[in-house]
C-alpha cells in the first residue's frame, strides 16, 4: 500500500558521529584523526546547526534556519569537506528550513532574482514547499551550491508551520530524498517521522532522547515497533542527547544496543559531560565501546546483504496472514525461520 523500503548507500550502515557542538575546522579534523588513531571506524560525520551563522540581526528572527557557513568556525568549507572526504568520511549538514531564506544569506541574491523579491526591502523568501518556484530556489540556489562544495546529504531536523491538510515535513522528506537519489551511491536523508509512508525516505530518527535508563529501556521497543509501519531504517540518539547524569554503565549498555540497531548514530548535546568519544571514559568502558564500534563495521557485509533481501523479498506479517492463530502458536510454528512476526 505504501511502497517498499529503499536501498541505502552502503556507507550508511557504518558508524555515524554527530554532536551539537560549535566545531572549528581544526577541532573537527583533529577529532576525526583521533578516531583513526584509536582504530575506531567512522563512515559519516554530521555537523549540527553551528556550521551556519546563528547569531543574526534581530530583524531577521531566530538563527535556527541558516544556509551560510559560519566562517569564524569554518573559514574554508571547501577545504574542510575535501579533507574529510580524503579521510573516507561522508558529511551531512543539519538544517531547520522553517524560516525560509532571508536577506543576510549568501544565497539570497540568487534566490531573490529567481523569485522576483525586493532586495532593497530585504523581502524574505517565505518557506512554502507547496510552491514549485520556492522549491526550485531552495534546491538550485541554496542546497546545490553547498553540495557542490562537498556536502553529501542533509539532516532535516525539524519543520514547523503546517499548511493546509499536509505536514510540510512530509513534503521536505519526499523532495529531499527524491533529490538525493541523483547521487551515484543512492539516496539518503536523516529526518523525523512525518506520518505513514515516511519509510520511503530513510533514514528516520526519533528526536532528542533523554539520558536515562528509562529512555534506554524504551528504545528497543520503539525501534522494533517502527517496523510495524515499514520503518526499517530507524535511528535514535545513541547514549542519549540531553539532561540526565554521567553514567558509564548506561553509556556502555546503550552503545551495545546501538551497534545492533538499524543505524548506529552517536549524538549528544553541547554539554561537556554528554559527549560520546570513547576515550573520554574509563579504560574499561572505553575498551568495550571501541570493541563494539569496530564490530559494527565488521557486520556491514552481513547488514548490506540483508538489506538487499529486505528489498527483494516482501513478506506478509504472519499475525495478519493467519489471524485465527494465537501468538504462542505462531511463535512455535515460525521458530528458527526468517519471518516477520
Regions found by a protein language model. Give the residues of each.
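Catalytic-domain carbohydrate-binding cleft regions of carbohydrate-active enzymes
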Residues: 1-341
Amino acid at each position: 500500500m505504501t511502497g517498499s523500503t529503499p536501498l541505502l548507500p552502503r556507507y550508511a550502515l557504518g558508524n555515524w558521529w554527530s554532536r551539537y557542538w560549535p566545531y572549528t575546522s581544526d577541532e573537527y579534523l583533529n577529532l576525526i584523526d583521533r578516531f583513526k588513531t584509536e582504530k575506531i571506524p567512522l563512515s559519516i560525520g554530521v555537523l549540527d546547526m553551528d556550521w551556519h551563522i546563528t547569531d543574526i540581526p534581530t530583524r531577521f528572527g531566530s538563527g535556527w534556519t541558516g544556509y551560510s557557513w559560519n566562517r569564524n568556525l569554518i573559514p574554508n568549507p571547501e577545504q574542510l569537506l575535501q579533507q574529510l572526504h580524503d579521510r573516507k568520511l561522508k558529511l551531512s549538514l543539519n538544517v531547520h528550513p522553517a524560516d525560509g531564506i532571508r536577506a543576510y544569506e549568501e544565497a539570497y541574491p540568487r534566490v531573490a532574482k529567481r523569485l522576483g523579491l525586493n532586495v532593497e526591502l530585504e523581502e524574505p523568501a517565505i518557506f512554502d514547499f507547496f510552491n514549485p518556484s520556492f522549491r526550485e530556489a531552495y534546491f538550485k540556489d541554496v542546497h546545490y551550491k553547498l553540495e557542490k562544495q562537498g556536502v553529501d546529504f542533509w539532516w532535516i531536523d525539524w519543520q514547523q508551520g503546517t499548511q493546509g491538510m499536509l505536514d510540510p515535513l512530509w513534503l521536505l522528506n519526499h523532495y529531499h530524498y527524491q533529490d538525493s537519489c541523483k547521487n551515484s551511491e543512492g539516496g539518503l536523508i536523516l529526518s523525523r517521522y512525518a506520518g505513514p509512508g515516511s519509510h520511503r525516505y530513510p533514514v528516520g530518527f526519533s528526536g532528542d532522547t533523554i539520558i536515562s535508563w528509562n529512555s534506554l529501556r524504551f528504545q528497543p521497543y520503539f525501534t522494533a515497533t517502527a517496523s510495524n509501519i515499514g520503518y526499517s531504517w530507524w535511528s535514535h540518539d545513541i547514549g542519549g542527547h540531553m539532561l540526565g547524569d554521567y553514567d558509564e554503565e548506561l553509556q556502555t549498555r546503550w552503545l551495545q544496543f546501538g551497534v545492533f540497531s538499524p543505524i548506529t548514530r552517536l549524538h549528544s548535546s553541547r554539554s561537556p559531560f554528554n559527549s560520546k568519544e570513547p576515550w573520554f571514559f574509563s579504560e574499561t568502558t572505553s575498551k568495550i565501546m571501541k570493541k563494539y564500534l569496530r564490530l559494527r563495521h565488521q557486520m556491514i557485509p552481513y547488514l548490506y546483504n540483508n538489506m538487499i533481501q529486505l528489498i527483494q523479498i516482501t513478506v506478509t506479517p504472519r499475525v495478519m496472514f493467519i489471524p485465527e492463530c494465537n501468538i504462542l502458536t505462531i511463535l512455535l510454528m515460525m521458530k528458527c525461520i526468517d519471518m516477520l512476526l
